[in-house]
Amino acid sequence: MTNNERIPSHVAIILDGNGRWAKQRGKTRSFGHKAGFDKVKDIASYASLRGIKALSLYCFSTENWNRPNQEVNFLMSIPIKFKEESKIYKEKNIKVIVSGRKDRIPKNTLDAMNDLVDDTKESTGMILNICFDYGSLNDLMNTINNLVENGTKLDEEKAIYSHLSTNPVGPVDLLIRTGGEKRLSNFLLIEAAYAELYFIDKYWPDFNNEDLDNAILEYSKRDRRYGGIKDE
């Protein structure tokens, strides 16, 4: 950490590479997802310590349903394990919210997520936004449909943020993708309209505190102009 560092308020991470990480070790993809799950609490805790206000994690996309049933079933069990760690998040004053569809998720999975949200609702520190069965285009479609149905007309562009499922966290400042790929994959497309993008080859289970520090340092060096120009 340097004196000139600017800490991004909202950091979003695409948790990519669990399966490839496991394959390198001769393990199943579920083994990789378990390792990725274990990494979440560590990075969330450190992000909170660094002063980040909101951390959004892409845990399960609307497209991930196309994966093999065995893998999907395992991914559906992960939020149940999140519930078991609610004490950790409460101790660190981290508030957990969930963004994404709720209608396709198994009841025991949804109950576990709702319990975790309820257990941490009094926390006043960093918001940990678990994006589960989330897709930005789907979220935008639902938002537009709701606005039309309610006869709501937006007076300015920024007003759209308050109607998205990610409303509590708002625009993204820094978006990180692990695993070497360089695309957004339908993640927070509106919220990340002016985000700084940071790609790292490391797979998510290997991502550590130093990697987050490096991403923040790189963010601090970026000149965010939002389409304007700097004063001469």
Enumerate the predicted regions with their spans.
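Flexible, compositionally biased loop and terminal segments
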Residues: 1-232
